[in-house]
């Protein structure tokens, strides 16, 4: 476990306020362990927080702190073991869908015309992606493309017309295996014009709209709650957590985090497999 002092670091001895802390938690690689020998899609469906994490969330609630999920996952892919943590709300789809309690305060999607043109390019170049929206996910798998990127019970579409037929076209982002990236240049400039790519680790990336990320989502949630950055914390492990870190006062990287994420953090805790979330919360006197 590493510890680095920084301007954002708050210790138990230097609390400036007794107001409840607000803590934002990534899911994959932070609350839930991803094993390298298990396909990412299976972990999304079957991964569960450890008993230590469940108890830590109970203690946070007991102390009056507000815990939020802050994940690239859409609401459709947040399963009961995570929902049962009983959070105060969620920043989902990497900042596109924002919830306080059960109320959705913002839900943003890719323009349908833009999405159509991108999917036409993916179909032409045989690029396989997981299209993710708040309430629906579709594996776009053109003929001749890779069949690895799927989830149990996922809807599969082979053509743009099929995507229209099986969905409402309300998608906010898409995920893919990194070996698809060389094909993206042949798709055209629409991707670089409208999207940012984040490496999620384990050979998988996601693309989100340029003006939508976890940092945007956190700032909107804090604004809605009437709070500034004081006594706000974030736990994360991958590139899409960097905007999240910029939106809070104190950032905590997991011990299994990417090097760039550790470098950006005020504090590096233990790995997800060693209950690093629990260690970090204890370090800051939050539980």
Each model region followed by its residue ranges:
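Basic, amphipathic juxtamembrane/active-site segments
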Residues: 35-59, 253-255
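Short, structured coil segments at secondary-structure junctions
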Residues: 85-86, 94, 190-194, 247-248, ...
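Conserved acidic, metal-coordinating active-site core of Asp-based
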Residues: 125-247, 256
């Amino acid at each position: 476990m590493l510890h680095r002092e920084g301007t954002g670091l708050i210790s138990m001895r230097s609390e400036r306020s007794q107001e409840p802390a607000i803590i934002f938690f990534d899911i994959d690689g932070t609350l839930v362990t991803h094993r390298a020998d298990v396909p990412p899609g299976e972990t999304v469906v079957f991964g569960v927080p450890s008993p230590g994490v469940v108890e830590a969330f109970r203690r946070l609630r007991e102390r009056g702190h507000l815990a939020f999920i802050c994940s690239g996952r859409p609401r459709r892919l947040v399963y009961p073991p995570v929902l049962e943590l009983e959070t105060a709300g969620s920043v989902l789809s990497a900042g596109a869908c924002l919830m306080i309690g059960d109320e959705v305060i913002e839900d943003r999607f890719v323009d349908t015309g833009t999405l159509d043109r991108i999917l036409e390019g993916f179909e032409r170049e045989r690029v396989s992606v997981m299209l993710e929206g708040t309430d629906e996910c579709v594996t776009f798998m053109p003929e001749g493309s890779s069949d690895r990127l799927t989830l149990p019970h996922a809807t599969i579409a082979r053509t743009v017309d099929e995507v229209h037929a099986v969905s409402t076209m309300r998608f906010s982002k898409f995920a893919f295996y990194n070996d698809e990236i060389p094909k993206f240049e042949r798709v055209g400039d629409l991707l670089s014009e409208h999207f940012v790519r984040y490496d999620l680790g384990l050979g998988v990336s996601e693309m989100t709209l340029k003006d939508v990320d976890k940092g945007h989502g956190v700032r909107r949630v804090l604004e809605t709650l009437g709070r500034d950055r004081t006594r706000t914390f974030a736990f994360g492990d991958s590139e899409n957590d960097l905007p999240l870190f910029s939106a809070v006062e104190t950032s905590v990287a997991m011990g299994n985090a990417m090097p760039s994420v550790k470098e950006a953090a005020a504090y590096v805790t233990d790995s997800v497999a060693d209950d690093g979330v629990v260690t970090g919360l204890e370090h800051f006197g939050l539980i």
